[in-house]
Structures are given as structure tokens and as C-alpha cells.
Amino acid sequence: MTDNARQIVLEHATEGAKLRERYFQQNADRVVELALQMALTLARGRKIMFCGNGGSAADAQHLAAEFVNRFMMERPPLPALALTTDSSILTAIGNDYGFEQVFQKQVQALGQPGDMLVGISTSGNSPNVVLALKAAREKGVTTVGMTGRGGGEMAALCDYLLDVSDRRTPLVQEIHITVGHLLCQLTDHFLFENVLALQPYLEGKAPE
């Protein structure tokens, strides 16, 4: 039994490492592109919102905390919030309108043109995240998806999509939080270490 348990550990680590290496070989440029857009969003005085369910809700809260507090360097707090944390709002909307609208209504209330919404879903099909992305598009909020399994319904709603094309939920989640950490680090890099990279875009050039 001990040998079997050890094998489970090693197989998970091996498969996770293979998927991680393949993912970042294919998507490194997309991660950098999104981090640049996050930095521009914040440099323009806008905010980043996050939403998801279950483990993805935990990721949403984790990443919002990294922006508001700090990541790896000392720097000013950055405006970010998770739409998963207020039990009164979540239960009021869920009770009166249904769980599908718990993020949508918050985006309608809080989202402003130029803000960003990051929806996290390992399936890409979470109804409440899908509706939140639709609401964001209606309000001129930049839409981002962190998904698995090809992106699902979210793919068509996202200005930026980081999809882990795999059906193993734990491995998808592990890459999501790694991507999130890289986005935090790179956003800090653009805002506080390489601000010259932002200047052309702040002066009117559209990101490529």
C-alpha cells in the first residue's frame, strides 16, 4: 500500500510537470501580453475583478489579495477585488435571483469602462462566470478567462483567454495559480521596474 501511495505522488508530479512545461512553452507570450494589459488597466486608474467557484473562487481571492497587499516586491497597493467574498451580497442575489447571477449583478454594480474582469473556471462553462463575462462586455470591461478543456462557453466572451487544454481538474488548477502568480509578478514588473514599456500604450498606441 505504501508503494502504491508513493506511486500516486510520483505520477501526479510527473504528469503535472509535463503539462506545465508544455503549457508555458505554448503560452508564455500570452501570459506576458495579459500582464501588460493588466498593468495598463491599473496605470489608467482602473481595477481588476476576479470571480470563480470552489477552488477557482479560492484562486480569485488569492490573486486579488496579492494585488491589494503585495506579491514579491514592496510597492503601493493595487486596486483588485474578488467577487466571491461578501456572503450577504452572494446570498441576497442567490436567494432572490438565482446563483447564476451572483457575479453578474456585482459586475453591473461595480464595473466601469476600462476595468478588467478575470473569470476562472476549469470547465469554461460555469453559468455564473459566463453571465458575469457577458455583463462585463456590456459595460466596456475587458474580459479575461482562465479555463480548461478548450475554454467552453467562456472562450467566445473573452478578450484574453488562457486555456489549459486538459481535462484533469487538479492539474488545470495548479497551472491556473501558477499563471496567476506570474501575472502578479509581471504586472509589478511593468508598473514598477519597466514602466517605459507602458509609455507608448498610455500615449495612445494599441497593444499588439
UniProtKB/Swiss-Prot annotation:
Assembly behavior = Homotetramer.
Entry keyword annotation includes GTP-binding: no
Fetch the Pfam families from UniProt: SIS_2 (PF13580)
EC numbers listed for it are 5.3.1.28
Q: What is this protein called?
A: Phosphoheptose isomerase
S-S pairs:
none
Question: Binding residues for substrate, per the UniProt record?
Answer: N53, G54, G55, E66, N95, D96, S121, T122, S123, S126, Q173
Phylogenetic lineage:
Bacteria, Pseudomonadati, Thermodesulfobacteriota, Desulfovibrionia, Desulfovibrionales
Q: Which UniProt keywords apply?
A: Carbohydrate metabolism, Cytoplasm, Isomerase, Metal-binding, Zinc
Give the UniProt entry's GO cellular component terms. cytoplasm
Which reaction does this enzyme catalyse, per its entry? 2 D-sedoheptulose 7-phosphate = D-glycero-alpha-D-manno-heptose 7-phosphate + D-glycero-beta-D-manno-heptose 7-phosphate
Pathway(s) served: Carbohydrate biosynthesis; D-glycero-D-manno-heptose 7-phosphate biosynthesis; D-glycero-alpha-D-manno-heptose 7-phosphate and D-glycero-beta-D-manno-heptose 7-phosphate from sedoheptulose 7-phosphate: step 1/1
Q: Which cofactor does it need?
A: Zn(2+)
The cofactor note from the UniProt entry for this protein is: Binds 1 zinc ion per subunit.
What miscellaneous comment appears in this entry?
Answer: The reaction produces a racemic mixture of D-glycero-alpha-D-manno-heptose 7-phosphate and D-glycero-beta-D-manno-heptose 7-phosphate.
> Is the keyword Chaperone in the record?
no
Domain (SIS) spans 38-200
Q: Where in the cell is it found?
A: Cytoplasm
- Which organism was this protein described from? Nitratidesulfovibrio vulgaris (strain DSM 19637 / Miyazaki F)
Q: Which domain of life is it from?
A: Bacteria
Its main subcellular localisation, reduced to a broad class, is cytoplasm
Concerning PROSITE patterns, the annotation shows: SIS
Tell me the HAMAP family matching this sequence.
Answer: GmhA (MF_00067)
